[in-house]
Curated annotation (Swiss-Prot):
Assembly behavior: NDH-1 is composed of 14 different subunits. Subunits NuoB, C, D, E, F, and G constitute the peripheral sector of the complex.
Gene: nuoB
Protein family: Belongs to the complex I 20 kDa subunit family.
Enzyme Commission number: 7.1.1.-
Full protein name: NADH-quinone oxidoreductase subunit B
Lineage of the species this protein comes from: Bacteria, Pseudomonadati, Chlorobiota, Chlorobiia, Chlorobiales
GO MF annotation list: 4 iron, 4 sulfur cluster binding; iron ion binding; NADH dehydrogenase (ubiquinone) activity; NADH:ubiquinone reductase (non-electrogenic) activity; quinone binding
Residue positions binding [4Fe-4S] cluster: C39, C40, C104, C135
Catalytic activity: a quinone + NADH + 5 H(+)(in) = a quinol + NAD(+) + 4 H(+)(out)
Length: 190
């Protein structure tokens, strides 16, 4: 249940909770910082292009960690790069989220077995909220992952830990295709 689902009384008053207002504002203006390290970055760039139009979801890419609330890690993270990933993560303001995109950032990809220099998943150095599988994942998969981050934000409550919010999200999974179709119908109607 979001802000727009709240009850409207007397056509002048909106009755809702502070959690709903704060979460609606945060999920409606998600500012990701892309950290593309390999071929997954090409798919991330394609997702930002006009074909997929992330701005219709309220997602506006940023290039500075100080302006971002979501880090998109895409590609092979090496041991030398790990320090920089941690530094960028620490520069992001709270609340901050991490989306790991592709096999390499999720688990080391095809390089994990024979590459001593490859990190076996970015979650070994920073906490990851959403994983997007694939090698490389299609833009539709990335949009689905971004929508999961938005659902995670929607379920947050003041005083509720992120772990509990993740459990709620696992109990009530979302269907990204249905939401994209709903967005298309709304755009056609207007």
């Amino acid at each position: 249940m979001g802000l727009l689902d709240a009850g409207i009384t007397n056509h002048n008053v909106l009755v809702t909770s502070v959690d709903n207002v704060l979460n609606w504002a945060r999920l409606s203006s998600l500012w990701p910082m892309g950290f593309g390290l390999a071929c997954c970055a090409i798919e991330m760039m394609a997702t930002n292009a006009s074909n997929y139009d992330l701005e219709r979801f309220g997602i506006f890419p940023r290039s500075s960690p100080r302006q971002s609330d979501l880090m998109l890690v895409a590609g092979t993270v090496t041991m030398k790069m790990a320090e920089r990933v941690i530094r960028l993560y620490e520069q992001m303001p709270e609340p901050r989220y991490v989306l790991s995109m592709g096999s390499c950032s999720n688990s080391g990809g095809p390089y994990w077995e024979h590459g001593y220099h490859v990190l076996k998943g970015v979650d070994r150095i920073i906490p990851v909220d959403v994983y997007v599988p694939g090698c490389p994942p299609r833009p539709e998969s990335l949009i689905g992952g971004l929508m999961k981050v938005q659902e995670l934000i929607r379920m947050e409550q003041i005083g509720l830990s992120r772990a509990d919010a993740l459990k709620k999200l696992a109990e009530n999974p979302i269907d990204p295709q249905a939401i994209i179709e709903q967005q298309r119908k709304t755009a056609v109607a207007h």
